[in-house]
């Protein structure tokens, strides 16, 4: 800390500050003086900060310094609580806060000067988005941004030129070299002219060469124009694709949507736009006009000092107290009449505030949605340029994902069924093979037994008869089964219809009960909601009344406190006057002449006598001046006449000297006569 203070003191003692501090005087600086030192250091970095803080409010001083420190990117150590401590310390001029700031500023003064200079031109003026809807404002803002970019480019070039080390001597040397080269080129041109003039048809050759140069320039211009048209065509194709995608998305949205939903959405948009145009925007415009009027009024008025501001604050407090008293009188007078209306008014004000808040939220959401759509379109264009494929939009992507999920589940189920069927097929195939082998063995055994008994072919004939009888029985059974199935199906249908009727009867009865219960619950919900709204409005009104009462009591407390301070000041003044009167009485009663001379009465008596003597002398002087005024005026007139006479003689003498003599001047007895 001591090294920090020493560095600050040494830097302040040097140019351009020249404070002549030592450790004792610097450490004994008061908070106001320390803030003035900080303001002087900031003024060295930014000349706009050259302010006498005694003529500035503390809040304005802190705001000005904090804004400049923010531009200079000063970061005090600590968290949010330390930041609040830093702001408070900057307001009151705390040394633990001011010393690190001074040390940081004085360490990098030149760098911060450059940063403050650039901040004047590179801090962008934020324009509200609703103002940018105006074409004039948008064009001006665009021009402003272009000028800012041009300034950045020029500043970079300036810095590069400073780093490159070009000097005026080198530039002059280059200029002289270019002039010499120009002279050489002129000589070469003259030499070539002389050589060409000797050739035949040199004028025609020069004309052809000139035409060739013009055509080459025209060819370059056409190539450049061709490239520009290619770029325009590319941008137009991109724009066409973007518009086609928008049209496709709109058609899909229109195809997916119903007319009722579209009409409902359009009605909501119309209501919202109507509210914005008829209520919100006129209010904001009126508020902005009032604010502009007040600001113009403030700008037109002369600058006010601290005393004027205190006087205005006292007037504002008096007017506020009068307004509160009038409101209280009005409330007391109109309480029985407007008791019921106040509740509805407060409810209406609460609803209007909620409506405005929701409108602002909706406007912000729309702006955010528009920005996200612009960003998404940019990303889609980048993706299309990268791999040439279309990017699915939100709804399309959701449908694609859902379709893919459903197909995936179906695929998994089918795959599982196929695996089960494969396993079952393998098992059945093995069973079939075993049964075939067993059947073949049994057939071989049967044939051998028939051959042994001498009745070969009997089993085959028996099998054929059984097969034919089985087929006949199957056909008969199928016919009977068909009739039975038809009659059974009719019975089932009748029974199913009766069951559904009975089941639906209970369901319909239950549905009626549920509908009735729903209506009762809806009615109860509406009643509870109205009770809640009225209770909330009543609580809101009570809260507003309590806030007004608290505000009024605080104002009364402030008034009583100011009245208390005023009374104390008056008491002190009266005590001083009483002390003076007591001292005067003591001096007047005292027998000491020296004490009597100190009395104010004696001093006033003495001053009165002196003034009377002075008035008497002045009256005598006035009398003398009045008596001598007439002769003096006469004497002054005689002197003026004498002066005119001498001037006339002078003119005559000069005329006599300059012209030829046309007469004779005779002097006799102190008189001059001119004889022509």
UniProtKB/Swiss-Prot annotation:
Recorded coiled-coil stretches: 132-258, 306-389, 416-456, 490-622
GO molecular function: tubulin binding
Gene Ontology terms: cellular component: centriole; centrosome; ciliary basal body; ciliary tip; cilium; cytoplasm; intraciliary transport particle B; motile cilium
Main location group: other
Residues bearing PTM N-acetylserine: 2
Region feature (CH (calponin-homology)-like region): 2-121
Family: Belongs to the IFT81 family.
Disease: Short-rib thoracic dysplasia 19 with or without polydactyly: A form of short-rib thoracic dysplasia, a group of autosomal recessive ciliopathies that are characterized by a constricted thoracic cage, short ribs, shortened tubular bones, and a 'trident' appearance of the acetabular roof. Polydactyly is variably present. Non-skeletal involvement can include cleft lip/palate as well as anomalies of major organs such as the brain, eye, heart, kidneys, liver, pancreas, intestines, and genitalia.
UniProt remark on domains: The CH (calponin-homology)-like region shows high similarity to a CH (calponin-homology) domain and mediates binding to the globular domain of tubulin.
Subunit structure: Component of the IFT complex B, at least composed of IFT20, IFT22, IFT25, IFT27, IFT46, IFT52, TRAF3IP1/IFT54, IFT57, IFT74, IFT80, IFT81, and IFT88. Interacts with IFT74; the interaction is direct: within the IFT complex B, IFT74 and IFT81 mediate the transport of tubulin within the cilium. Interacts with tubulin; the interaction is direct. Interacts with IFT57 and IFT70B. Interacts with RABL2/RABL2A; binding is equal in the presence of GTP or GDP. Interacts with IFT88. Interacts (via the IFT74/IFT81 heterodimer) with RABL2B. Interacts with CFAP61.
Name this protein carries in UniProt: Intraflagellar transport protein 81 homolog
Biological source species: Homo sapiens
């Amino acid at each position: 800390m001591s090294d920090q203070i020493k560095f600050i003191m040494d830097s302040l003692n040097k140019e351009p500050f020249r404070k002549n501090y030592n450790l004792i005087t610097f450490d004994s600086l008061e908070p106001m003086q320390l803030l003035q030192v900080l303001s002087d250091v900031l003024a060295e970095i930014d000349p706009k900060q050259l302010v006498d803080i005694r003529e500035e409010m503390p809040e304005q001083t802190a705001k000005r310094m904090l804004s400049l420190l923010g531009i200079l990117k000063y970061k005090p150590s600590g968290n949010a609580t330390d930041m609040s401590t830093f702001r408070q310390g900057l307001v009151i001029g705390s040394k633990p806060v001011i010393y690190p700031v001074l040390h940081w500023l004085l360490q990098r003064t030149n760098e911060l000067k450059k940063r403050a200079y650039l901040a004047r031109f590179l801090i962008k003026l934020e324009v509200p988005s609703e103002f940018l809807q105006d074409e004039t404002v948008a064009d001006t803002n665009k021009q402003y941004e272009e000028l800012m970019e041009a300034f950045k480019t020029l500043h970079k070039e300036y810095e590069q030129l400073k780093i490159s080390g070009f000097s005026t001597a080198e530039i002059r040397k280059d200029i002289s070299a270019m002039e010499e080269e120009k002279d050489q080129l002129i000589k070469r041109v003259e030499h070539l002219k002389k050589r060409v003039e000797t050739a035949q048809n040199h004028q025609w050759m020069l004309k052809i060469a000139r035409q060739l140069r013009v055509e080459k320039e025209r060819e370059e211009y056409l190539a450049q124009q061709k490239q520009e048209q290619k770029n325009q065509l590319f941008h137009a194709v991109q724009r066409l694709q973007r518009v086609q995608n928008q049209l496709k998305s709109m058609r899909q949205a229109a195809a997916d949507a119903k007319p009722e939903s579209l009409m409902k959405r359009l009605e909501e948009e119309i209501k919202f736009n109507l509210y914005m145009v008829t209520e919100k925007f006129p209010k904001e415009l009126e508020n902005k006009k009032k604010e502009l009027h007040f600001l113009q009024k403030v700008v037109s008025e002369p600058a006010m000092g601290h005393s004027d501001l205190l006087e205005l604050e006292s007037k504002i407090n008096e007017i506020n107290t009068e307004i509160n008293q009038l409101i209280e009188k009005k409330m007391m007078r109109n309480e029985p009449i407007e008791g019921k209306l106040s509740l509805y008014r407060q409810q209406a004000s609460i609803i209007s505030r909620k409506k405005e808040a929701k409108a602002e939220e909706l406007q912000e959401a729309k702006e955010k949605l528009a920005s996200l759509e612009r960003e998404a379109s940019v990303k889609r264009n980048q993706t299309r340029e990268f791999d040439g494929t279309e990017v699915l939009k939100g709804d399309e992507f959701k449908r694609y994902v859902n379709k893919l999920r459903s197909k995936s589940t179906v695929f998994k189920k089918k795959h599982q069924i196929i695996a089960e069927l494969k396993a079952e097929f393998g098992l059945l195939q093995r069973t079939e093979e075993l049964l075939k082998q067993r059947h073949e063995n049994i057939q071989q055994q049967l044939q051998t037994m028939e051959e042994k008994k001498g009745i070969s072919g009997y089993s085959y004939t028996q099998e054929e008869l059984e097969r034919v009888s089985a087929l006949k029985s199957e056909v008969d059974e199928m016919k009977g089964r068909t009739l039975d199935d038809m009659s059974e199906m009719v019975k089932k249908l009748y029974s199913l219809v009766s069951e559904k009727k009975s089941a639906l009867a209970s369901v319909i009865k239950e549905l009626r009960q549920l509908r009735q219960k729903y209506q009762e619950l809806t009615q109860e919900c509406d009643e509870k909601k109205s009770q809640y709204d009225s209770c909330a409005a009543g609580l809101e009104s009570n809260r507003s009344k309590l806030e007004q009462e608290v505000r009024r009591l605080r104002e009364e407390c402030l008034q009583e406190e100011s009245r208390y301070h005023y009374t104390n000041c008056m008491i002190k003044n009266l005590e001083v006057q009483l002390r003076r009167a007591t001292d005067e009485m003591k001096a007047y009663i005292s027998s000491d002449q020296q004490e009597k001379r100190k009395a104010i009465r004696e001093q006033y008596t003495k001053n009165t006598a002196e003034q009377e003597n002075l008035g008497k002398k002045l009256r005598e002087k006035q009398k003398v001046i009045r008596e001598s005024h007439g002769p003096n005026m006469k004497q002054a007139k005689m002197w003026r006449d004498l002066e005119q006479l001498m001037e006339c003689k002078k003119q005559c003498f000069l005329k006599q000297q300059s012209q030829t003599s046309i007469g004779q001047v005779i002097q006799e007895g102190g008189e001059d006569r001119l004889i022509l």
